[in-house]
Amino acid sequence: MKTVIVPAPGKIEIRQVETPVINAYQALVKTEMVALCNATDSKLVAGKFPGVDTYPLALGHENAGIVVAVGEKVRNFKMGDRVIGGLISDFGAQGINSGWGGFSEYVVVNDFEVLKEEGLATPEQGCWDSFEIQNAVPSHVQPEEAVISCTWREVLGAFKDFNLTPGKKVIVVGSGPVGLSFVKLGKLFGLGQNKDAGIVLKYRTQFLRTY
């Protein structure tokens, strides 16, 4: 399969690599759509992501695709499901480090609920957040909609972390994709006031008015 590689800071190439082999708790996903993360991906390409200084690495973590194979212990994914958040955390002996590896033709999702039940996924293992966000989406959700939810799930997580409940007021600083998502989700959550204090571009002001 093909994957997007950063061989060294400031460089990007497409490289042929081995297709992942899933274990009993995983599903194999054929990628349909990916999105570029302005923070993580751009910093990995620039060589400025904190704690990552070993290259080459496989790029990407925002994607959507269709399940094409499932492990024997998987219960929460089935053939044909559209899922988000697939990764490749280990490229084995291919000499490639993982920058999450989501910009690959095939990626892997883990059945997080089964892993928890069997004591194989804990916060201490460092896989908790990565596996928890790997989910199937409803069948009517299109690939371009599903991949955007990769950003929305992070915003939703922030709402939960800060205990944002209906009636509370929020000021959003910044009007990029994440800032716009905060405003939109704030309205859906019934927050009392959702203002963006960092709007610079007029088209984003107009876009916000549609919310």
Predicted stretch roles:
Residues 1-59, 122-129:
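Short N-terminal strand-loop motif that marks the start
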